[in-house]
C-alpha cells in the first residue's frame, strides 16, 4: 500500500486497526515509517520516506501535442485534469497564422461551446478551469457553460499599460472565468498579496467597532492584524503585462503571451499533488501556462494547432 497518498487522519486509523502504540503524536512521515515497518514482507514496492520529504510516486507527463483541440480533447481521459487554463482566440482579428480569430460571432460561440464541453469532461470533479477573455466576449461565452457548473469572475489588471482607444474607456484589464464542478480547491495562503499602504498605515493594529445592522448590533469590536505573509488574495490580480521594458526579458514572438507570474498564480491557487492529474492547456500558444506548470513541478498537456508555436513552446520548455 502507498501510504504517502493518505492523510494523517487516515494513517492514524490504520495504526488503530493494527493495534499499534505511540502513534497519536507522530507526524505523517513518522506514521508512514511505522506502518511500513509493520507491514509483512511482500513483492509490492513500499513508499520510501527520507527525512521529511515524501518521494514522488507518479511520473511527470509534460508534453505539447500539435493539432486541433476539438480533435485532441476527445482522446483525453475523463476526470483526468486537475487544472485547465484556456486562453482561446478572442475573435478580435489577431493573427495566429490561421483564420481562427475571424469568425462570425454565432460560429465562434458554437465553437467555444464544443471545446468547453470537452474540457469540462476532462476536468476532475474537484478541479478548476480558467478561461481568459475580454469581458464583452466572456459574457457571451459564459452562456455556453452548463448551469450546474459553479463559476466566479475575476480580473487581470495590467497595471503597466492601456489598450489605446480615442473614443472610449482605455482597456486596462482582461477577465478570467473560474469554473469548478463540485468542491473547489483553493490555497489562499499560497497566493497572498502585499498589503496596501493605506491598510498598513491606517488600519493595521487598530480597533474598530462593528457596523450596526451588518454583523451585529454594533456592540462588537474588531482589531485588524496584518498577516505576516500578506493580504488575502483579491479577485483583481495586479500583474504587469509583457509590454515595454517590463516584458523585455520574457517576451517571445506571440501576439497574446501571458506573463509567467500570472500563470503561476492561477496554478498555485488550486494545485493538487502530481498524482491527482495534470494541467491541461487547450490553446498552448506561447507556452506560458505549460512552463508555469513545469516550474511548479506539475504534469501538463498542451495542445497547439500552429506548428511554429509548438516549436516556440518546446524551446521555452527546454530553456
Predicted regions and their residues:
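PRPP-dependent phosphoribosyltransferase catalytic core
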Residues: 312-319
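The DNA-recognition helices of helix-turn-helix-type DNA-binding domains
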Residues: 18, 38, 286, 296, ...
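Small/flexible residues
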Residues: 7-10, 20, 30, 194, ...
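Core catalytic lobe of class I
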Residues: 44, 48, 53, 57-303, ...
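Basic helix-extension-helix modules of the SAP/HeH family
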Residues: 1-48
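Conserved hydrophobic residues forming the short capping helix/wall of the S-adenosyl-L-methionine
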Residues: 15, 145, 317
Amino acid at each position: 500500500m502507498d501510504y504517502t497518498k493518505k492523510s494523517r487522519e487516515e494513517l492514524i486509523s490504520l495504526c488503530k486497526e493494527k493495534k499499534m502504540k505511540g502513534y497519536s503524536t507522530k507526524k505523517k512521515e513518522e506514521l508512514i515509517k511505522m506502518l511500513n515497518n509493520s507491514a509483512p514482507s511482500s513483492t509490492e514496492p513500499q513508499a520510501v520516506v527520507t527525512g521529511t520529504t515524501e518521494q514522488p510516486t507518479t511520473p511527470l507527463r509534460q508534453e505539447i501535442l500539435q493539432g486541433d483541440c476539438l480533435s485532441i480533447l476527445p482522446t483525453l481521459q475523463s476526470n483526468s485534469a486537475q487544472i485547465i487554463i484556456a486562453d482561446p482566440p478572442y475573435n478580435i482579428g489577431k493573427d495566429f497564422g490561421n483564420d481562427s480569430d475571424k469568425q462570425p460571432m454565432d460560429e465562434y460561440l458554437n465553437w467555444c461551446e464544443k471545446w468547453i464541453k470537452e474540457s469540462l469532461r476532462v476536468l476532475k470533479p474537484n478541479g478548476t478551469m480558467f478561461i481568459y477573455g475580454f469581458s464583452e466576449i466572456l459574457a457571451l461565452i459564459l452562456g455556453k457553460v452548463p448551469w450546474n457548473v459553479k463559476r466566479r469572475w475575476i480580473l487581470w489588471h495590467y497595471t503597466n499599460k492601456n489598450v489605446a482607444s480615442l473614443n472610449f474607456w482605455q482597456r486596462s484589464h482582461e477577465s478570467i472565468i473560474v469554473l469548478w464542478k463540485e468542491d473547489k480547491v483553493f490555497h489562499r495562503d499560497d497566493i497572498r498579496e502585499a498589503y496596501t499602504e493605506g491598510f498598513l498605515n491606517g488600519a493595521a493594529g487598530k480597533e474598530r467597532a462593528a457596523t450596526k445592522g451588518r454583523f451585529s448590533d454594533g456592540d462588537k469590536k474588531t482589531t485588524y492584524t496584518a498577516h505576516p505573509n500578506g493580504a488575502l488574495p483579491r479577485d483583481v490580480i495586479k500583474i504587469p503585462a509583457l509590454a515595454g521594458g517590463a516584458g523585455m526579458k520574457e517576451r517571445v514572438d506571440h501576439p497574446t503571451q501571458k506573463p509567467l507570474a500570472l500563470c503561476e498564480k492561477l496554478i498555485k491557487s488550486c494545485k493538487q499533488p502530481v498524482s491527482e492529474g495534470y494541467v491541461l492547456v487547450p490553446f498552448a500558444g506561447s507556452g506560458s501556462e505549460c512552463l508555469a506548470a513545469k516550474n511548479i513541478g506539475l504534469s501538463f498537456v498542451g495542445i497547439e494547432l500552429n506548428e511554429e508555436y509548438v516549436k516556440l513552446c518546446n524551446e521555452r520548455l527546454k530553456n
